[in-house]
Swiss-Prot record:
Pfam families: PGK (PF00162). The keyword Transmembrane helix does not apply. GO terms for biological process: gluconeogenesis; glycolytic process. This is Phosphoglycerate kinase. Keywords: ATP-binding, Cytoplasm, Glycolysis, Kinase, Nucleotide-binding, Transferase. InterPro entries: Phosphoglycerate_kinase (IPR001576), Phosphoglycerate_kinase_CS (IPR015911), Phosphoglycerate_kinase_N (IPR015824), Phosphoglycerate_kinase_sf (IPR036043). The lineage of its organism: Bacteria, Pseudomonadati, Pseudomonadota, Alphaproteobacteria, Hyphomicrobiales.
Amino acid sequence: MTDFRTLDDAGPLQGKRVLLRVDLNVPMEGGRVTDATRIERVVPTIREIADAGGRVILLAHFGRPKGKPDPKDSLKPILSTLSEKLGRPVAFGEDCVGEAAASAVAALKDGDVILLENTRYHAGEEKNDPDFAKALAANGDIYVNEAFSAAHRAHASTEALARLLPAYAGRLMQAELDALTKGLEAPARPVIAIVGGAKVSTKIDLLENLVAKVDMLVIGGGMANTFLHAQGKDVGKSLCEKDLAETAKRILAAAKEKNCTIILPVDALVAREFRANAENETVPVDAVPSDAMILDVGASSIATIDGAIEEARTLVWNGPLGAFELTPFDTGTVAVAQHAARRTKAGQLVSVAGGGDTVAALNHAGVGEDFSYVSTAGGAFLEWLEGKELPGVEALRAQG
């Protein structure tokens, strides 16, 4: 983390107006928050700044209101949950810039917290407009970015604003950057990556970057079928992007050149129906019945993956190994996740995981708390794994 300034570098916060960019893009139903994870994760930083006498001004986006106010994308319904989790009142500003924001911020006392309305109510936000960023900056003395999940987008509140005020990484951002550095940039070796999920097409850049950086790469989920097909195996009615066979071959060749061991399933749990508890059998991957589909890795594959994890000192995981939302096709994902969690708890493995399905799969396996770090930042986590620069992170680095 030496490249980034954190709250430790910000000096006394007493009386300072702190523009804190957070991710409050939480799922809502009927005007109520259904999963408060993202709110809970930013509470410690809000509390730390407020307890130090800072005036906390929360900036966030919600939904996709297309650059103009839309009541369904208002942040106001989040206020009660935010206040409850924080254990103190939170004021609300009807706009994030202009007179409404200025007067609301002017009324703050040391230690107060205010949430300003959706930054995406203004077209300048997604355009990274310098004038809009200046209007945001007018209400703050320093800027703290706590929204790693939005760091892959060069928006006014994540990028341009960070260049107008003294800028720092919040505690959550700091933890995320620390974890990712340990996972890929300066890892303890050997490093194993597990990449699953349905499609190769969405993860080509990711796979190409990983084969150059990791020692072992496990390919699972629906995307493994494309690789098996590329090797000339019949995958029956399984999900398979046959038009990407050449891409799969290219990735396999690149892995060989970089001395990255590719681990593909050797056996599979197959069924004729895509539903929970469908009649199933375990078969070798070169004997998949033509009317069946692969829905999980088999016992021999699990043993191979577990053995590889035994050798590794670092694990990076993105995507499930099978259709984990349907029993018993969650067996592979659950078994491997629990094995990785045991190694992590024993201090033998640094485990970093991220991506929506991955977080859900680890929670389903009951090990969401046992990995070294689980990132809630879907797109930003993927782009980091792809080796891309993240504008919101680079803006913090530039001042470091």
